[in-house]
Amino acid sequence: MTHEPLTASVGIVTPQHVRLFGASTPLQLDGGTLLHSVDVSYETYGTLNQERSNAVLICHALSGNAHAAGYHSKDDKRPGWWDHYIGPGKPFDTNRYFVIASNNLGGCDGTTGPSSIDPATGMPYGLNFPMITIGDIVRVQHALVRQLGIERLMAVVGGSMGGMQALQWALDYPHMVPASVIIAAAPRLTAQNIAFNAVARQAIMADPHFNGGDYYTLPGDPTTKARPESGLALARMMAHITYLSEQGLHERFGRRLQDRDALSYGFETDFAVESYLSYQGSSFVKRFDANSYLYITKAMDYFDPFPDAETTVQRLTGVESHFLVMSFDTDWRFDTSRSKELVRILHRSLKDCTFQEFSSPAGHDAFLLPHPSYEKSLGSFLLRTWQSITGGQA
């Protein structure tokens, strides 16, 4: 398979793994429980400079992973999920920056989560995995960054749930984060967003194969347990609708029929948009764990760093970040008003914050897709940050 020229790509990348924390230094979770070890999957792109001052941490969204750019092999059909933005000459210019991406705590792509083996039992955690928060996820990222020998990041960047993490970083480690980029996110979920997550979780737990979260088949087990694929697919289909815009759906599908010239007058898949959503659901269950979906959506529900005025003042005191907050005009899952809410909070505390809204028919998913104006703004902000820290010239 032919990929884009290596001058525009980070090329072939190798996933890396590290075990953090330990029996004497466990991870203290916000819920009060402990994890005595956490495995983390991560990837890096570019080179860490001698001063260790050019590191940029990228935080992924709900269903993302550590594979943000490049290819794992020459046979890969697709690059990492943000490949358009990471590489030589791109906004995350790997000729200048050392870019880090890791799989989140609670995930299912190499980092400890519900599908991992519980050392205490030798069995997958399942629903015995402790509840986690965005703060817990960031705590693990912080441990990874320190493990890499980095005392201060150049910037933390994230979209959607990744934007929540970028904000949490600025609050929890104010002296480590001179720049924060928060894209298509919000300072807390609305009741509507919590409702979307609740229905998705119910779809998973109502699947007859959910079995209280115990559906894993261990290596060497002669019996194969059925997984709650129907419930997870339904959760994904519903969520995916919220990631798109009405305009985008209309332009792409309208009322076009799928593989037919006339209505079936039955419950077959008549419309192209039905087929598209079915594909999204069926492909998602091949790469994602249902229990991880439960835990991560709960972490998003719990996120609320500014519950009242007094807490807001306390949390923002000492924060050193320069903020860039970005939104898209057709994103109704995290609409522009939510980004502006965050901007108002930051401005009231006299924090340096720039806000930009971009026009796109792609809805919430626009932050993942090519967009010249968005790309230019993101790249310019990172370049200015790099120049201010390193004294480098463009």
Curated annotation (Swiss-Prot):
Taxonomy, superkingdom: Bacteria
Pathways involved: Amino-acid biosynthesis; L-methionine biosynthesis via de novo pathway; O-succinyl-L-homoserine from L-homoserine: step 1/1
Keywords: Acyltransferase, Amino-acid biosynthesis, Cytoplasm, Methionine biosynthesis, Transferase
SUPFAM superfamilies: alpha/beta-Hydrolases (SSF53474)
Binding site for substrate: 236, 365
InterPro entries registered for this protein in UniProt: AB_hydrolase_1, AB_hydrolase_fold, HAT_MetX-like
Record's subcellular location: Cytoplasm
Active site residues per record: 160, 331, 364
UniProt keyword Membrane, yes or no: no
Enzymatic reactions: L-homoserine + succinyl-CoA = O-succinyl-L-homoserine + CoA
GO molecular function: homoserine O-acetyltransferase activity; homoserine O-succinyltransferase activity
Transmembrane segments: none
Annotated Gene Ontology cellular component terms: cytoplasm
Keyword Transferase belongs to the record: yes
Enzyme superclass (EC): transferase
Domain AB hydrolase-1: 54-368
EC number: 2.3.1.46
Chain positions of site Important for acyl-CoA specificity: 333
Any one GO biological process: methionine biosynthetic process
Subunit composition and interactions: Homodimer.
Record function comment: Transfers a succinyl group from succinyl-CoA to L-homoserine, forming succinyl-L-homoserine.
Name of the protein this chain belongs to: Homoserine O-succinyltransferase
